[in-house]
A protein has these predicted regions:
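Alpha-helix N-capping/helix-start residues
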Residues: 25, 84, 110-111
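Short, exposed beta-strand-loop hairpins at the edges of beta-sheets
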Residues: 106-111, 116-124
Length: 128
C-alpha cells in the first residue's frame, strides 16, 4: 500500500512538472511586449537591457557586448545558467532575486505568463 501511494505521488509530481513547462509561445510573444522596450528576443542586439535571443540555457551575464550591473555580475558567479527554474525565480521579482539590478521591471506574477514567456524565449520562431 505504501509503495502504491508513493508511485501515485510520483506520477502526479511528474505530471505537474511537465505541465509547468508547457507554455504557449504565441501567448508568450504577447507577454514579451512588456519587455520589448528594453530587450529583443529575435536579434542579437542590445537595447537598454541585453539581447534575450538564446537566453534559455545561456550563462547569466554572458552577453559580451552588454555592460551588466555589478549586482548581476555578482549574481552570475558560480556558473549560474538561465534555465527554466532560474527564470521562474527571477521573472516574478527581478529586484528581489538580484538586489541592485538595473532592471526596473516589477515582474510577472501570473504562472501562465511565466510558462508562456519561457516558451517564447526558448523558441521565438514558434510564435509565428
Amino acid at each position: 500500500m505504501r509503495l502504491h501511494c508513493l508511485l501515485i505521488a510520483s506520477v502526479l509530481l511528474l505530471s505537474a512538472s511537465a505541465s509547468l513547462a508547457d507554455g504557449d509561445a504565441k501567448a508568450g510573444a504577447q507577454v514579451f511586449k512588456k519587455c520589448q522596450a528594453c530587450h529583443t528576443a529575435t536579434e542579437p542586439v542590445n537595447k537598454v537591457g541585453p539581447s534575450l535571443m538564446g537566453v534559455v540555457g545561456r550563462p547569466v551575464a554572458s552577453v559580451a557586448t552588454y555592460s551588466y550591473s555589478p549586482a548581476m555580475k555578482a549574481f552570475s558567479e558560480g556558473g549560474k545558467v538561465w534555465d527554466e527554474a532560474l527564470l521562474r525565480q527571477y521573472l516574478p521579482s527581478p529586484q528581489f532575486l538580484v538586489k541592485g539590478t538595473r532592471m526596473t521591471f516589477p515582474g510577472l506574477r501570473s504562472s501562465k505568463d511565466l510558462d508562456d514567456i519561457i516558451a517564447y524565449l526558448k523558441n521565438p520562431a514558434a510564435a509565428q
